[in-house]
Amino acid sequence: MDGTIKEALSVVSDDQSLFDSAYGAAAHLPKADMTASGSPDYGQPHKINPLPPQQEWMNQPVRVNVKREYDHMNGSRESPVDCSVSKCGKLVGGGESNTMSYTSYVDEKNGPPPPNMTTNERRVIVPADPTLWTQEHVRQWLEWAIKEYGLMEIDTSFFQNMDGKELCKLNKEDFLRATSLYNTEVLLSHLTYLRESSLLPYNTTSHTDPSSRLNVKEDPSYDSVRRGGWGSNMNSGLNKSPPLAGAQTMSKNTEQRPQPDPYQILGPTSSRLANPGSGQIQLWQFLLELLSDSANASCITWEGTNGEFKMTDPDEVARRWGERKSKPNMNYDKLSRALRYYYDKNIMTKVHGKRYAYKFDFHGIAQALQPHPTESSMYKYPSDISYVPSYHTHQQKVNFVPPHPSSMPVTSSSFFGAASQYWTSPTGGIYPNPNVPRHPNTHVPSHLGSYY
């Protein structure tokens, strides 16, 4: 008789684990986990209550997995989010297993489901972009988040009749009207993560390596640390690296971007600096002369547009420099020692980690080319400086003048008494030309030699 009943019930449900005697006995224990179900009381707030043994529904909480699938679904942009939820079955006679209106998904490329997925799990497909969610998708996501993160006291009626676009428009204050601060941070963080992840480029190939998929939950011990995940850092999802396929696509786009020609950018500058005008050419100017012509790329060439260059044939560069300086014994060792002289002058530097690579410092070259004042000009006094008499207290001092020079000799016993004739006489004064300024306590002009 018992065999007949089991055979009849097996036709109704495909889950044989429901009829295991040990499993059925354990099912009468009180359940305290939040499970995603398709019960019609979605509009009411969730409450965590033990399920009595006489209840019509027996929920079997199982592990919930969330995985990002980066495959295109029929060419659309709705790259799915794969959520696994528990499947609930009625225990009354003739009842069918409730599919909760989730769309089942079988990954043909990956073969059978992973070992950690039991027969009580059923996958659902929702778009990767939350703005494309329907009201049903929002309900599925909310029920999954409640079960996955152990959220309590959420007014689910607040999210009723709300699609993905309306959900993404909610801010923190809106979420706080429906739940606590902790739950708000968890929901907002996960929603932000999904929106940012949906912007990543997807692989357009027909097959995707399973190892490149982004798995949110992989470790069975995830439940012990999940409260420190989304809730502790709202932006933790933004720091995740893009998938392998997206990284390859971005690197390919970077390589395809046209690079500027360094000879067009640095050519005029190299030609101008390489021309010494008069005098002998220096080694750094000779190198700029070679770099100004792309025909010399076989021995020396630019590496980018920041002044870095490389000697592809250093022996040829040394040979050409020896010809210019009439030194047939010139080699790269001697040339490299000569280049070290320019390091301290900020004309060029050695690029570490690269052989035969150097970098010009155009700012240092500009400073090195500025004219410096000669030594004789430092002792030359400007002709437009007016000097005051020596008996004034504020005497202007000039460089390299003795602090206490000898006083000017006079012939009159009364120096101040004869001052009027001394200064006012147009022809008898010591200065032949009265317009010449007086320079006391300084170098005496040559025309006063007869006076002294």
Curated annotation (Swiss-Prot):
Keyword field contains Zinc: no
One CC-aspect GO term: nucleus
Major localisation: nucleus
Gene label: FLI1
Assembly: Can form homodimers or heterodimers with ETV6/TEL1.
A molecular-function term among this protein's GO annotations: DNA-binding transcription factor activity, RNA polymerase II-specific
The species this protein was found in: Bos taurus
Stretches the record annotates as Disordered: 202-272
UniProt name for this protein: Friend leukemia integration 1 transcription factor
